[in-house]
Amino acid sequence: VANPTAVDGAFADALAAWGRLDTLFNNAGIGSFSTTIDEIPVQTWLDVVSINLTGSFLCARAAFKIMREQSPKGGRIINNGSISAHAPRPGSIPYTSTKHAITGLTKSLSLDGRPFDICASQIDIGNALTDMAQAMTTGMPQPDGSIRPEATMDVTHVASSVLHMANLPLDANVQFMTVMAPKMPFIGRG
């Protein structure tokens, strides 16, 4: 997703196959956790920014172009934010920074998309049990320095939430949604 040529090619293929684009779920992402800023290799920072932010920008840009030009115009771009954008984890500077930036991308897309019937929204997901989140069940660093297991939820709850957002008509939008395991640390995390 961080290669502009590959992204543009994928969207061109989708347009050729289906004739239009109604929804983009910007869902690619990687994490880098467990160290302080002075120990983060610059390449790690660049890798996380490249996938999480540049990749989301490139996909949104390609989708926006198609949605703006198709007839009837319009569509929906749903960005995968994160609870970490609002309540960071210890040692998560690259990941958290990109997720803050996704919120800015979402707000700007919402504003720029209005004249073209393009809705933008964001889902902030917390502790959905995927391969990326498996470590949460055995223990994650907490703000007090301890390592504790965290509650997780079935990833199908995320899927049904995204489908709800995607299925709305273009005269309605869920601007921001948070879906999370209710017993995970979030409110009062730090």
Q: What function would you assign to each model-found segment?
A:
Residues 82:
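Residue(s) in the substrate-gating loop at a strand-loop-helix junction
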Residues 35-37, 44-49:
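Substrate-binding pocket helix/loop in short-chain dehydrogenase/reductase
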Residues 65, 111-114:
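Alpha-helical segment proximal to the catalytic Tyr-Lys
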